[in-house]
Amino acid sequence: MTEAPHVVAEGTVLSFARGHRLQHDRVRDVWIVQAPEKAFVVEGAAPHILRLLDGKRSVGEIIQQLAIEFSAPREVIAKDVLALLSELTEKNVLHT
């Protein structure tokens, strides 16, 4: 039996799981998520979204901030943010 995917809701408050952190690699000028014994590059809007995760603000508050900051429709921002955060929660990079 497979486990149901982790779906992040707008009321969820997320932070990085223990041992995981976002870091800018100045040499390569890329953002990476450092994890125990591995690291992976995050591109596009992902670094900006991940920098807003502070363990205090809800996902909905982050979506609202991004919609205002980028003058973009909230629904578009929400779809992308929820997809990214759900994927990273599924991979145990983020937790509630």
Swiss-Prot record:
Classification via Gene3D superfamilies: Coenzyme PQQ synthesis protein D (PqqD) (1.10.10.1150)
InterPro entries attached to this UniProt entry: PQQD (IPR008792), PqqD_bac (IPR022479), PqqD_sf (IPR041881)
Key word Acetylation present: no
GO biological process: pyrroloquinoline quinone biosynthetic process
Sorted UniProt keywords: PQQ biosynthesis
Pathway(s) where this gene product acts: Cofactor biosynthesis; pyrroloquinoline quinone biosynthesis
A Pfam family this chain is assigned to: PqqD
NCBIfam families in the record: PQQ_PqqD
Summary of the function given for this chain in its UniProt record: Functions as a PqqA binding protein and presents PqqA to PqqE, in the pyrroloquinoline quinone (PQQ) biosynthetic pathway.
Quaternary structure and partners: Monomer. Interacts with PqqE.
Protein's name in the database: PqqA binding protein
Native organism taxonomy: Bacteria, Pseudomonadati, Pseudomonadota, Alphaproteobacteria, Acetobacterales
Gene name in the database record: pqqD
